[in-house]
Regions:
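Short, Lys/Arg-enriched N-terminal segment that forms or immediately precedes the first helix
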Residues: 2-15
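Short amphipathic alpha helix immediately N-terminal
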Residues: 20-32
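Hydrophobic positions on the alpha-helical face of helix-turn-helix-like DNA-binding modules
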Residues: 26, 39-40, 50
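DNA-recognition helix of helix-turn-helix
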Residues: 46-64
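Short Lys/Arg-enriched helix C-cap and helix-to-coil transition segments
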Residues: 62-75
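Helix-turn-helix/homeodomain-like alpha-helical modules used for DNA recognition
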Residues: 80-99
Length: 99
């Protein structure tokens, strides 16, 4: 099972591919640290439906990464950047992935 931090990183990359409701639910739970019950109350739904929605978002994020590999590619570029001795090239590589 992946860590919450991993899913937060994937969310930052792929949030544009999610519906507004999916984005809001995930954001409320992981960024605003609201409990599933609190989100359910706001959305006038059940805690179980919010749990299922968060689980579905995590599944979609995993699926997107499996197909598109943006995070994996970013990690590989950063790894290469760390092994490069040319300072200018290192900075260009880091800049290319927004770091």
């Amino acid at each position: 099972m992946e860590s919450d931090f991993y899913y937060i990183e994937l969310f930052e990359i792929y949030k544009g591919l999610l519906t507004e409701t999916q984005r809001e639910t995930f954001y409320s739970h992981y960024f605003l640290d609201l409990s599933l019950a609190e989100i359910a109350e706001q959305q006038k739904s059940s805690r179980q439906s919010v749990f299922d929605a968060v689980k579905k978002v995590k599944s979609k994020l995993t699926e997107y990464e499996k197909e598109l590999k943006i995070k994996a590619t970013e990690s590989e570029i950063l790894s290469i950047a760390e092994s490069v001795s040319d300072k200018a090239l290192k900075e260009r590589l880091k800049s290319a992935v927004g770091k």
